[in-house]
């Protein structure tokens, strides 16, 4: 398995220590605009499943920190990206469990 499940606090630590890490929100755009983690990019799960991967996810060796609303879609996204050859994936669940800053 190339992806790992980590806690929100571990994700925050990785964001703070690795500015190169890409924070990926796999919720729908209408969910993303209601509030998201600062610096996150919105790549809906449906796009990933359809193979519509944006340029911001072009580097399969980059570090990706993935989340959704409750943690279900983020696991699905991590598995799909893993099958596409991505090597550094971390799922930290849902924004519902995120105790830190949220950007609106």
Task: Give the role of each language-model region.
Residues 1-21, 29-63, 72-104:
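Rhodanese-like catalytic fold shared by cysteine-dependent sulfurtransferases
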Residues 67:
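Short, surface-exposed ligand- or partner-binding patches at beta-edge/loop junctions that are enriched
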């Amino acid at each position: 398995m190339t992806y790992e499940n980590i806690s929100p606090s571990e994700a925050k630590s990785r964001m703070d220590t690795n500015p190169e890490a890409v924070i990926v929100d796999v919720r729908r755009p209408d969910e993303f605009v209601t509030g998201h983690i600062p610096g996150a990019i919105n790549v809906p799960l449906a796009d990933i499943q359809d193979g519509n991967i944006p340029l911001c996810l072009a580097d399969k060796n980059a570090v990706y920190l993935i989340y959704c609303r409750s943690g279900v879609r983020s696991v699905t996204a991590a598995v799909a990206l893993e099958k596409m050859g991505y090597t550094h994936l971390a799922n930290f669940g849902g924004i519902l469990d995120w105790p830190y800053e949220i950007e609106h």
